[in-house]
Structures are given as C-alpha cells and as structure tokens.
C-alpha cells in the first residue's frame, strides 16, 4: 500500500546526490509545480500512476508520461481521449474511464468490447445495436436488464449474481450471514479506510472522500469476485486489515445500494455516504 512520507516540504526541499526519486515519485503527494521543476529527476512512470495530474499538465508533458498508466490511473475526459486516441491504451480506457454510449460507438473499432460489456453501463437499445460486438455472458451478469430483454435473448443469470436481488433478499442475507448492524431495516453503518489525504487507497486519482458527501460508482454484483470494481466497505477490523496507515471513515450504505457481499463479508456497493472520521 502507498504510504506518504513524513516531514516532506516542497518549499524547503533540497535534492542531494543520493536522493531517492523513485521513492519520492511514488510515496510523496507532489504538486505539478514541483514535478515540473524536477522533471528530469522524477520517475515519470510512477508520476503517471501515483500523482494526480490535470489534462493540461499531461498535455504539456505528453512525451514524458506513461500513457498506459494515464489511461488507467488518471481521470480523462472523452474530449482528451479523442485528441490522444493514438497514444492512450484502449484496453484500459475501456475499463477505467467512464464512457458514454455515443463515445463508444464513435470508437467502436478501438474499444475493447469484452471490457466494455463488463465495465461500462449500457442501455438495452445500445446492446441490441451492437449485439455482434458485445460479450453476452458478461452482459448477462454485469448489466441490469429487464425481464423482457432477458427472455428475448434467452439469458441465464447465475445465482452468484446479486444484480437482481431485492432489498428484502439483501436484508435477509445480511441478518443471517453477517454481523453488520441494520438500522431501521433501511441501511447499515460500516467502515472505509482511506489514505491520510482522504483519497482512495487503490485509485487515489479518482476518489477523494469528504465528510457529508455521497459517492457513486458502477459495481460488480457477483459474490464470488472478492476484489473487483465498485465502492467498498467493511467491518471496522476488516477496513483496518485492508489499510491501517491512513484515515478510518464511518459510512452509510442503503440496503438497495449494496451490489454484493463477498464470502469474506466485504461489501461492494453502487453508492455510499461518508458520515464521519473515526479518531482512535
């Protein structure tokens, strides 16, 4: 896990002969001004992965950044992706960037349809239009479909997929199989560990959590996938076991927003609200 350095001040920093630029590029939260000042020293592969960069900055240093990492770890607009369509990694773009159906259609020959079928939110109309490109098994377990659509295409939904579970079914599972406390039969209070700067541990450039705010994401609803996409939360101990070097947050998740609860009682959800920071 990424751990930030202590007592690092960009204003007073003076490099020396044995300065570990790899360590700084990975573990210190750097400003774009600092990165530019030491552009010939920093490790651009790790800058591309671990630092939050603006599109303007990426453009300025387009020959230095790692475009594979740009496509995976930075949040890019469709306009920016289109401008640098020959530089970005379309495999990662198809997974890690949020794409509109219009954009996917425009670049249908570049996107990875297997990943599009799994990671992007698609309408039934769009799926039908590109029925020869999409991967139907993934469509059946990752896209929320109407009963009529499922019957029309003779799709089979495995029992391990929670995508169609009702609120009542989720509620019963929680009460029978976990120790999570259910409040008013409507929501649960659980925990999320984040970095010291309140950013996501796994995707620091995509989520920075603030008290009182609600966050949404697409979510893998398959119970047998322990580590997958979606907003995650645990018991207090589970959150600390995952990452204990940063902040611990109390979060609220409505029952209907739960995507699944894995065998290890890890929660993946579509939406959660940050309530407060837990001070030990």
Model-found features: residue ranges?
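Alpha-helical scaffold segments
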Residues: 1-178
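Broad hydrophobic/π-residue packing in well-ordered secondary structure
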Residues: 61, 96, 107, 130, ...
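Short, surface-exposed loop and linker segments with low hydrophobicity and enrichment for Pro/Ser/Thr
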Residues: 109, 174-189, 239-247
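Generic structural signal for residues positioned in beta-strands
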Residues: 138, 189-190, 250
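ADP-ribosyltransferase catalytic core
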Residues: 216-280
């Amino acid at each position: 896990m990424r751990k930030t350095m202590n007592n690092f001040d960009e204003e007073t920093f003076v490099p020396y002969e044995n300065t570990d630029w790899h360590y700084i590029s990975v573990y210190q939260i750097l400003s774009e001004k600092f990165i530019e000042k030491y552009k010939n020293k920093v490790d651009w592969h790790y800058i591309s992965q671990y630092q939050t960069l603006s599109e303007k900055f990426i453009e300025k240093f387009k020959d230095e950044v790692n475009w594979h990492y740009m496509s995976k770890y930075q949040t890019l607009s469709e306009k920016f992706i289109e401008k640098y369509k020959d530089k970005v990694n379309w495999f990662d773009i198809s997974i890690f960037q949020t794409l509109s159906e219009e954009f996917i259609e425009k670049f249908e020959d570049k996107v990875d349809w297997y990943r599009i079928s799994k990671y992007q939110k698609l309408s039934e109309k769009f799926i039908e239009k590109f029925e020869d490109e999409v991967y139907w098994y993934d469509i059946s377990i990752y896209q929320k479909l109407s009963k009529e659509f499922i019957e029309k295409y003779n799709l089979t939904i495995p029992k391990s997929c929670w995508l169609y579970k009702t609120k009542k079914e989720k509620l019963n599972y929680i009460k029978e199989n976990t120790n999570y406390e259910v409040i008013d039969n409507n929501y649960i209070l659980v925990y999320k560990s984040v970095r010291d700067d309140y950013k996501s541990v796994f995707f620091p450039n995509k989520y920075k959590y603030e008290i009182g705010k609600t966050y949404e994401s697409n979510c893998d609803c398959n119970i047998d996938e322990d580590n997958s996409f979606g907003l995650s939360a645990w018991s207090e101990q589970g959150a600390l076991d995952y990452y204990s070097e940063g902040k611990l947050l109390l979060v609220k998740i409505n029952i209907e927003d739960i995507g699944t609860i894995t065998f290890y009682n890890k929660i993946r959800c579509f939406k959660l609200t940050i309530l407060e920071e837990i001070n030990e």
